[in-house]
Amino acid sequence: VHGRIRATCGRVLHAPIDPDTLGSALGDLVARPRRDIDSIGGRSPAMLGVRAMLHRYADVDLPVLITGESGTGKELAAHALHELSRRRERPFVAVNCGAIAPTLVQSELFGHERGAFTGATVRRMGLFESADGGTVFLDEIGDLPLEAQTNLLRVLQEGTLERVGSHRPVRVDVRVLAATHVDLDAA
Protein backbone atom coordinates (compact mmCIF):
# COMPACT_ATOMS: atom_id res chain seq x y z
CA VAL A 1 0.00 0.00 0.00
CA HIS A 2 2.79 2.43 0.94
CA GLY A 3 4.45 1.87 -2.45
CA ARG A 4 1.16 2.39 -4.29
CA ILE A 5 0.52 5.68 -2.46
CA ARG A 6 4.07 6.85 -3.10
CA ALA A 7 3.72 6.00 -6.82
CA THR A 8 0.73 8.30 -7.16
CA CYS A 9 2.38 11.21 -5.33
CA GLY A 10 4.19 13.91 -7.23
CA ARG A 11 6.56 14.63 -4.36
CA VAL A 12 6.72 13.76 -0.66
CA LEU A 13 7.27 16.75 1.65
CA HIS A 14 8.45 16.43 5.23
CA ALA A 15 7.59 18.88 8.03
CA PRO A 16 8.55 21.58 8.62
CA ILE A 17 7.83 22.59 5.04
CA ASP A 18 9.71 25.51 3.54
CA PRO A 19 7.28 27.90 1.73
CA ASP A 20 9.47 27.89 -1.42
CA THR A 21 9.49 24.09 -1.50
CA LEU A 22 5.72 24.00 -1.06
CA GLY A 23 5.26 26.56 -3.85
CA SER A 24 7.49 24.53 -6.16
CA ALA A 25 5.63 21.30 -5.35
CA LEU A 26 2.25 22.93 -6.00
CA GLY A 27 3.54 24.34 -9.28
CA ASP A 28 4.68 20.86 -10.33
CA LEU A 29 1.29 19.44 -9.39
CA VAL A 30 -0.58 22.03 -11.46
CA ALA A 31 1.71 21.46 -14.46
CA ARG A 32 1.34 17.68 -14.29
CA PRO A 33 -0.96 16.16 -16.91
CA ARG A 34 -4.37 15.08 -15.70
CA ARG A 35 -4.86 11.47 -14.78
CA ASP A 36 -6.08 9.23 -17.60
CA ILE A 37 -9.14 7.13 -16.74
CA ASP A 38 -7.49 4.03 -18.20
CA SER A 39 -4.86 4.18 -15.46
CA ILE A 40 -7.52 3.82 -12.75
CA GLY A 41 -8.35 0.48 -11.22
CA GLY A 42 -7.63 -3.03 -12.38
CA ARG A 43 -8.02 -5.02 -15.56
CA SER A 44 -10.88 -7.28 -14.47
CA PRO A 45 -13.88 -7.60 -16.78
CA ALA A 46 -15.96 -5.65 -14.24
CA MET A 47 -13.50 -2.72 -14.18
CA LEU A 48 -13.20 -2.73 -17.97
CA GLY A 49 -17.00 -2.51 -18.09
CA VAL A 50 -17.00 0.40 -15.63
CA ARG A 51 -14.38 2.27 -17.66
CA ALA A 52 -16.33 1.69 -20.87
CA MET A 53 -19.47 3.02 -19.20
CA LEU A 54 -17.61 6.12 -17.95
CA HIS A 55 -16.36 6.84 -21.47
CA ARG A 56 -19.86 6.31 -22.88
CA TYR A 57 -21.56 8.74 -20.47
CA ALA A 58 -18.83 11.36 -20.09
CA ASP A 59 -20.08 13.63 -22.87
CA VAL A 60 -23.77 12.99 -22.29
CA ASP A 61 -24.59 16.28 -20.60
CA LEU A 62 -27.30 14.85 -18.36
CA PRO A 63 -27.40 14.08 -14.63
CA VAL A 64 -25.91 10.72 -13.62
CA LEU A 65 -26.66 8.70 -10.47
CA ILE A 66 -23.77 6.49 -9.35
CA THR A 67 -24.74 3.69 -6.97
CA GLY A 68 -22.65 1.27 -4.96
CA GLU A 69 -21.51 0.26 -1.52
CA SER A 70 -19.38 2.61 0.56
CA GLY A 71 -15.75 2.57 -0.53
CA THR A 72 -16.35 1.30 -4.07
CA GLY A 73 -15.10 4.44 -5.82
CA LYS A 74 -18.25 6.42 -6.55
CA GLU A 75 -16.44 9.74 -6.13
CA LEU A 76 -13.57 8.48 -8.29
CA ALA A 77 -16.12 7.62 -10.99
CA ALA A 78 -17.63 11.12 -10.68
CA HIS A 79 -14.18 12.71 -11.06
CA ALA A 80 -13.56 10.51 -14.11
CA LEU A 81 -16.86 11.54 -15.72
CA HIS A 82 -15.90 15.19 -15.19
CA GLU A 83 -12.34 14.75 -16.49
CA LEU A 84 -13.58 12.95 -19.61
CA SER A 85 -16.28 15.55 -20.33
CA ARG A 86 -16.21 18.87 -22.17
CA ARG A 87 -16.48 20.49 -18.72
CA ARG A 88 -13.04 19.25 -17.58
CA GLU A 89 -11.49 22.75 -17.66
CA ARG A 90 -14.23 24.12 -15.39
CA PRO A 91 -14.72 23.46 -11.64
CA PHE A 92 -15.57 20.11 -10.10
CA VAL A 93 -17.35 20.81 -6.80
CA ALA A 94 -18.09 17.87 -4.50
CA VAL A 95 -20.26 17.91 -1.40
CA ASN A 96 -21.42 15.19 0.97
CA CYS A 97 -25.12 15.93 1.46
CA GLY A 98 -25.17 14.18 4.82
CA ALA A 99 -22.33 16.31 6.18
CA ILE A 100 -24.14 19.65 5.85
CA ALA A 101 -26.31 20.75 8.77
CA PRO A 102 -29.97 20.74 7.66
CA THR A 103 -30.29 24.43 8.55
CA LEU A 104 -27.40 25.32 6.21
CA VAL A 105 -28.11 23.11 3.19
CA GLN A 106 -30.01 25.74 1.19
CA SER A 107 -27.37 28.40 1.78
CA GLU A 108 -24.45 26.04 1.07
CA LEU A 109 -25.89 24.71 -2.18
CA PHE A 110 -27.78 27.69 -3.56
CA GLY A 111 -26.19 30.70 -1.81
CA HIS A 112 -27.83 33.53 0.09
CA GLU A 113 -28.42 37.26 -0.04
CA ARG A 114 -27.17 39.72 2.52
CA GLY A 115 -29.66 39.88 5.40
CA ALA A 116 -31.41 36.62 4.44
CA PHE A 117 -30.91 35.33 7.98
CA THR A 118 -29.04 36.22 11.15
CA GLY A 119 -25.34 36.29 10.35
CA ALA A 120 -25.76 36.73 6.58
CA THR A 121 -23.76 39.96 6.40
CA VAL A 122 -22.76 39.56 2.74
CA ARG A 123 -24.18 37.93 -0.36
CA ARG A 124 -22.65 34.50 -0.85
CA MET A 125 -22.59 32.23 -3.88
CA GLY A 126 -23.54 28.62 -3.24
CA LEU A 127 -21.80 25.54 -4.56
CA PHE A 128 -23.88 25.49 -7.74
CA GLU A 129 -22.89 29.02 -8.72
CA SER A 130 -19.25 28.38 -7.87
CA ALA A 131 -19.29 25.36 -10.19
CA ASP A 132 -20.84 27.29 -13.11
CA GLY A 133 -19.76 25.67 -16.37
CA GLY A 134 -18.49 22.62 -14.51
CA THR A 135 -19.78 19.73 -12.46
CA VAL A 136 -21.44 19.42 -9.06
CA PHE A 137 -21.08 16.04 -7.34
CA LEU A 138 -23.70 15.39 -4.65
CA ASP A 139 -22.44 12.48 -2.57
CA GLU A 140 -25.07 10.65 -0.52
CA ILE A 141 -27.91 12.40 -2.37
CA GLY A 142 -30.45 10.44 -0.30
CA ASP A 143 -29.51 12.57 2.72
CA LEU A 144 -30.58 15.80 1.00
CA PRO A 145 -33.57 17.40 2.82
CA LEU A 146 -36.86 17.54 0.89
CA GLU A 147 -36.84 21.34 0.54
CA ALA A 148 -33.38 21.25 -1.02
CA GLN A 149 -34.52 18.45 -3.35
CA THR A 150 -37.22 20.78 -4.66
CA ASN A 151 -34.64 23.46 -5.41
CA LEU A 152 -32.31 20.88 -6.97
CA LEU A 153 -35.14 19.85 -9.28
CA ARG A 154 -35.40 23.46 -10.45
CA VAL A 155 -31.67 23.49 -11.24
CA LEU A 156 -32.02 20.23 -13.18
CA GLN A 157 -35.16 21.22 -15.11
CA GLU A 158 -34.68 24.95 -15.67
CA GLY A 159 -30.99 25.60 -15.08
CA THR A 160 -31.82 28.28 -12.51
CA LEU A 161 -31.68 28.70 -8.76
CA GLU A 162 -32.76 31.26 -6.21
CA ARG A 163 -30.44 32.27 -3.42
CA VAL A 164 -31.91 32.19 0.10
CA GLY A 165 -33.56 35.58 0.65
CA SER A 166 -34.07 36.30 -3.05
CA HIS A 167 -36.84 35.74 -5.56
CA ARG A 168 -34.68 36.54 -8.57
CA PRO A 169 -33.59 33.47 -10.56
CA VAL A 170 -29.88 33.02 -11.23
CA ARG A 171 -28.94 31.01 -14.33
CA VAL A 172 -26.37 28.25 -13.80
CA ASP A 173 -24.81 25.83 -16.26
CA VAL A 174 -23.76 22.75 -14.30
CA ARG A 175 -23.79 19.02 -14.78
CA VAL A 176 -25.05 17.21 -11.71
CA LEU A 177 -23.57 13.89 -10.70
CA ALA A 178 -24.95 12.19 -7.61
CA ALA A 179 -24.05 9.10 -5.63
CA THR A 180 -25.63 6.92 -3.01
CA HIS A 181 -24.97 3.65 -1.24
CA VAL A 182 -28.67 3.00 -0.58
CA ASP A 183 -31.49 1.90 -2.87
CA LEU A 184 -33.34 5.21 -3.30
CA ASP A 185 -36.47 3.49 -4.61
CA ALA A 186 -36.73 1.48 -1.39
CA ALA A 187 -35.84 4.40 0.90
Q: Where on the chain are the PLM-derived regions?
A:
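N-terminal accessory segments that target, anchor, or regulate ATP-driven/P-loop NTPase machines
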Residues: 1-35
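AAA+ ATPase active-site-proximal loops
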Residues: 34-171, 176-183, 187
